[in-house]
């Protein structure tokens, strides 16, 4: 089976119509999660970088749109396209974090509410015992600027896999093919997959479009 569990559209600040995203996935994949950007609990840390202050309004405006009817539209369309046995859809949404790195909460239930948090660790606590995966992605960016911090990794059912590859590039290490192409910076060894493995962590690996 092939799918994409981290796929964006313009419901927040991705590109392309949401229905087009589902239609394209249905033509080629077995399952998908079209994933809104939903929150950034430590966004005020951007104030330490004057050149990045514009980013705050850009993101918070999108989060407001999601909470002013956007999430209900997203949830309804996710249910509409779910066709068990042929094509599965999943509710998922993304939280950014300067400290912890970006994560997606992927829900088994198609009735999942939008759950906020004060930090990624707080998010993980809220989802304990539920059928929710909390997975880090674009892990190779610089720690402190939305790259992953392996000291917060918890091995187990809640985070059975991490995202090694996406349109951002390859997070296997800080060298090698497909460098990071986004304006959030080059790859950083301490956030990479190989670094996590060298710490003795055990996890599965996935790739998504993001």
Labelled PLM ranges:
Residues 1-209:
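Extended, charged catalytic domains and RNA/DNA-binding interfaces, predominantly
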């Amino acid at each position: 089976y092939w799918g994409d569990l981290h796929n964006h559209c313009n419901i927040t600040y991705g590109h392309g119509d949401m229905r087009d995203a589902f239609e394209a996935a249905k033509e080629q994949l077995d399952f998908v999660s079209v994933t809104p950007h939903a929150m950034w609990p430590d966004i005020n840390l951007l104030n330490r970088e004057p050149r990045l202050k514009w980013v705050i309004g850009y993101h918070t405006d999108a989060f407001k749109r999601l909470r002013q009817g956007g999430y209900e539209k997203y949830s309804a369309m996710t249910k509409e396209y779910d066709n068990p046995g042929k094509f599965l859809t999943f509710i998922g949404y993304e939280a950014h974090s300067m400290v912890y790195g970006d994560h997606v909460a992927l829900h088994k239930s198609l009735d999942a509410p939008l759950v906020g948090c004060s930090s990624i660790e707080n998010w993980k606590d809220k989802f304990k015992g539920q059928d929710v995966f909390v997975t880090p992605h674009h892990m190779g960016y610089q720690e402190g600027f939305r790259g992953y911090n392996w000291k917060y990794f918890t091995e187990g059912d809640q985070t059975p896999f991490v995202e090694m590859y996406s349109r951002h590039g390859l997070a296997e290490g800080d060298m090698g093919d497909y460098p990071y192409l986004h304006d959030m910076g080059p790859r950083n060894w301490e956030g990479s997959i190989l670094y996590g493995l060298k710490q003795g962590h055990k996890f599965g690996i996935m790739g998504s479009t993001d």
